[in-house]
């Protein structure tokens, strides 16, 4: 076999040079991902236009940009703003004028200049609009002297009291001779004692009782039921004197703890260890079973016989549908 013949099963790809012997051990990744030599950054075919003279349109323009002395199509607003600034000299950036009144400024514009260009107006909303009814009926009291006055008990005025008005005929409760020498409490024995609408039940019942009212009741420090029993005494429920020390008390007998007897409950009758679902829903019964557990009725008369024969049923055509005989030209019993 000559050296130039190809091995069976090997094909020449588009990337291989014709006439050369292919390598059958190469994979498809080798043919797909070929190694391409890198190209230099500055391609040899690129020609620089920096040294070329400017076009006639650019020469007539009075404003020349610093981007190769040519108007750039790719320059943006941010690119022209974020550049090195010059703070002095003929190429300095223009300065914003200072406002006349620094306290009344909005942004970088003077408020007076802003109002001169556009006057102050209310916003176009229904909040500031007034209807005819709202303009006539404002709800405020009118100063018309012809309006009728209210004739009734007027509130007392201090000027009328000093002129000898009817308020001088009132007797102060501190100078009432009928109640002089008696203990008097406004909230207890006042004139409005029975008509105090805002007096609570606790303030009316649990009040301060004088000694004259408590003379017919036994005192709290007398011998009571708690003195005989070994019950912890609460303050104001027993003798006001502190009890004797614990060391001088007789020893208490040991307490006999009676065990608590739990009530005996009878066992609940059940049908076995079955849950409610298992007891309620039993498995399917045999179709030939006569008596049912939940429905003790016999099978319907249209069901199969106990010894069903071939093609014999208790009801004619009980198990055949209309579609099975439709269009068959067979006589049907009605």
UniProtKB/Swiss-Prot annotation:
Location of region: Disordered: 81-105, 128-153, 233-260
Compositionally biased intervals (Pro residues): 240-251
Stretches with biased composition (Polar residues): 128-141
InterPro entries named among the record's database cross-references: Axonemal_MT_stabilizer
Transmembrane segments: none
PANTHER family the UniProt entry points to: HCG1796489
Protein name: Stabilizer of axonemal microtubules 3
Species of the source: Homo sapiens
Gene coding for it: SAXO3
